Amino acid sequence: MSDLSDSGLPPVQRVVTGHDANGRAIFKSGDVTPTRMIPSGDASFLLIWTTETVPADNNDETDGRLRDAGLTLNQGSVIRIVDMLPGKQSPMHRTNSIDYGIVLDGEIELELEDGAKKTVRQGGIIIQRGTNHLWRNTSNRVCR
């Protein structure tokens, strides 16, 4: 197992499936990888998977983690783990994408451009539809 993530939380297990030459389901890869701090120092990220197109080409053998992806991937999809540190927040921002935020641990506050706020706790899901927003961890625990 890998070291702790830069956030102090455990590393992330990733399991990827695919098909063998006979078309039968197989495990293509499995790894345990820690999140790593981003330059701003307010969160640590781990890219899990990307696709170049939607719908995805499941015959593409590229490891989706190895694609060059920014916060979004035009015409494709991106999934990443974000660990937001206690007392930290992102800048107000907007992406031309639909983002699905699933709170696995802790809690996060979502603030919209008009100052409206919602706190989402463990097990909660945010469907972020391209609005101007910021993320804030008001707790004393890391939020994943």
What are these regions, as identified by a protein language model?
Residues V32-P34, E61-R65, S77-N96, R129-H133:
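Conserved short histidine dyad/triad with adjacent acidic residue
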Residues S90-M92, L110-E111, T119, H133-S139:
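Short beta-strand His + acidic residue motifs that chelate non-heme Fe in jelly-roll/DSBH
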Residues M1-A56:
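N-terminal leader/capping segments at the start of a protein or of a new domain
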Residues D114-T131:
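Short acidic-glycine-tyrosine-enriched beta hairpin
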